[in-house]
From Swiss-Prot:
Part of the 50S ribosomal subunit. Forms a cluster with proteins L3 and L19. In the 70S ribosome, L14 and L19 interact and together make contacts with the 16S rRNA in bridges B5 and B8. SUPFAM superfamilies: Ribosomal protein L14. Coiled coil: none annotated. The gene is rplN. Transmembrane segments: none annotated. This is Large ribosomal subunit protein uL14. Keywords: Ribonucleoprotein, Ribosomal protein, RNA-binding, rRNA-binding. Binds to 23S rRNA. Forms part of two intersubunit bridges in the 70S ribosome. Belongs to the universal ribosomal protein uL14 family.
C-alpha cells in the first residue's frame, strides 16, 4: 500500500530515480494506493540530462509494491520494492523503456503501453 510521503523508485528511463508521493488519486478520502493506481509525486532524485528534473511534480502509476496485491483467484503477488512509472495526461509513459517486472493488474487499468514495454509481466 502506497500513501502520502512514500518514496518510490522509478522503473523507467524518464530521468527521475526517486519520487515522493504527494497524493493518491481517486477521491478526497482516499488514503492508500495499490498496483495500477495513479499518484501525484515530486521528483526527489534525477539523473542529469533526463526529461524529468528534480523538483518537478509528475503523475505516476504504481507498478510494484512490497505489500503486494490479492488477485481474483485468491493468490497474492509481492515485490521487493515500491516502484512507479511516470506517465503523461493520456496515461502513456514518459520514458521509452521499463525496467524490472510489472504486475498483470496494469492491463485492467488501460496501461497497455507500459505492459508492452515491460520485459516481464507477472
Amino acid at each position: 500500500m502506497i500513501q502520502t510521503e512514500t518514496r518510490l523508485k522509478v522503473a523507467d528511463n524518464s530521468g527521475a530515480r526517486e519520487l515522493l508521493v504527494i497524493r493518491v488519486m481517486g477521491g478526497s478520502k482516499r488514503k492508500t494506493g495499490n498496483i495500477g493506481d495513479i499518484v501525484v509525486a515530486a521528483v526527489k532524485q534525477a539523473t542529469p540530462g533526463g526529461v524529468v528534473k528534480k523538483g518537478d511534480v509528475v503523475k505516476a502509476v504504481i507498478v510494484r509494491t512490497k505489500s503486494g496485491a490479492r488477485r481474483e483467484d485468491g493468490s497474492y503477488i509481492k515485490f521487493d520494492e515500491n516502484a512507479a512509472v511516470i506517465i503523461n495526461a493520456d496515461k502513456s509513459p514518459r520514458g521509452t523503456r521499463i525496467f524490472g517486472p510489472v504486475a498483470r493488474e496494469l492491463r485492467e487499468g488501460d496501461f497497455m503501453k507500459i505492459v508492452s514495454l515491460a520485459h516481464e509481466v507477472l
